């Protein structure tokens, strides 16, 4: 479909949904998501340090930002509406990405959005890119370093925002021997178990959150703006 719409020799495309991490290679498009025991380990670790989901021999298009979409030439983002069977996770389409084409197959509609910031296969860079050393647990700092090195600038593309308040409901913690903190329900007979964080940010900015762990488990995140939070008039929005 997209090869007919855009016959350019190289660009990447990704999807807001995943059936498996091998969707790109299985359906014939170039993406970030992939799993293989023969994959290049340094390349996987680089993607992991830039915020992408990672699991030993796979990487997945979860944890993306405007910066990484631009850097890795994610020119199109595919969304699926209607029949969402076999859809495991979902990434939100940024407002800046504009609908370019779509097609319907059965009761499912596939929509393709163009990323106006995709940088292409290659770009001119400052020599300092060769000196960048990525840290283990801060993808936002890493992205700041990469783009400042590419452009020869000293900007803060991502800035850390403080947590104003946090509350735990039915949550206990324990320290593991490797320094990690384990979170678990205090009372397993109670279904509700969560942590609330209150943060303050610019209303027209995007909020990103990174939860590093060596012990991969499912984790649901909901968000709510201040007005709805204070009066309880609207339910929280599921973020992933």
Regions found by a protein language model. Give the residues of each.
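Soluble catalytic regions of membrane-associated enzymes that act on cell-envelope
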Residues: 1-239
């Amino acid at each position: 479909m997209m090869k007919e719409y855009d016959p350019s020799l190289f660009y990447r495309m990704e999807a807001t949904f995943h059936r498996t991490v091998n969707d790109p290679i299985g359906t014939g498009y170039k993406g970030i998501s992939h799993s293989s025991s023969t994959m290049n380990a340094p390349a996987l670790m680089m993607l992991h340090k830039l915020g992408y989901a990672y699991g030993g021999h796979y990487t997945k298009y979860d944890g993306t930002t405007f910066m990484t979409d631009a850097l890795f030439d994610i020119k199109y983002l595919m969304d699926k509406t209607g029949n969402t069977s076999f859809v495991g996770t979902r990434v939100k389409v940024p407002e800046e990405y504009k609908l370019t084409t779509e097609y319907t197959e059965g009761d499912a509609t596939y929509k393709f959005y163009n990323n106006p910031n995709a940088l292409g296969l290659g770009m001119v860079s400052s020599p300092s890119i060769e000196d960048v050393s990525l840290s283990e647990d801060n993808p936002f700092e890493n992205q700041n370093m990469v783009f400042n090195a590419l452009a020869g600038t000293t900007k803060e593309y991502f800035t850390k925002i403080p947590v104003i308040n946090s509350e735990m409901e039915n949550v206990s913690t324990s320290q593991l021997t490797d320094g990690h903190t384990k979170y678990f329900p205090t009372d397993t007979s109670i279904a509700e178990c969560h942590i609330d964080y209150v943060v303050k940010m610019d209303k027209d900015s995007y909020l990103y959150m990174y939860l590093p762990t060596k012990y991969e488990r499912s984790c649901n995140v909901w968000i709510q703006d201040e007005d709805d939070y204070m009066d309880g008039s609207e339910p929280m929005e599921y973020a992933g």
